[in-house]
Amino acid sequence: KMLKLSEENEVDMLNGYPLVNHGYRTSRKMMTHFDKPISLRHGTPDARLLIETALASGIFEIEGGPITYLLPYSKNFPLDKAFMYWKYVERICANYSKLNEPINRESFGPLTATLVPPCITIVIQLCEMLLSLEEGVKSFSVSFSQTGSMIQDIVTANVLRKMAKHYAEQIGCGDAMINLVYHQWMGAFPSNKDYSESLINTSTVIASMVRADKIITKTR
């Protein structure tokens, strides 16, 4: 509906690219044209068709999970169904990885994009990582977002990286590649430009200190 309205009014009314609507043929042409790595970030608890289309389009990084893409976006969706649907996603990614480069799965660490206790973030990240690795995924990214405390963020990164490696080895998946993603501040930004600049710069320093494999940036 929103795609149709956008075309009729010649105004973009979509929050993102309608991948399923355009289909894999059109999307693959676009991916080939730009020749840049694309990460799928969507926000749906049932991503089965979306993931199939994404992989056929040439997208090799899939964000989300049964918890991190359920609680922040779809509070009325059944949790057990979300786990069942994402288990299918993990198997698809694992099987496709056998034919090509490993599909990187990434959990959405910021959760509700508000201040979440690091212990909750870490436990949820580990749960989604284990679900993914148990289905055969060989590349997984755990993540979390800036909290406002440099010390807390550094400790969170160290614990998350250490625990992820530990539990991956516990289930016989020590050969999996585990990456760390750091999200810059996900909450409301200060109205003062200098304060906002300081927030962005501080998060960049933290990402460097924890040696994040990827940083989700905020534009100025």
Walk through the language-model features, giving the residues of each:
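Active-site capping/gating regions of soluble enzymes
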Residues: 152-170, 177-220
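Catalytic alpha/beta active-site cores
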Residues: 1-129, 133-135, 139-143
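Secondary-structure boundary elements
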Residues: 91-101, 130-139, 159-176, 209-213
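A generic structural motif
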Residues: 146-151
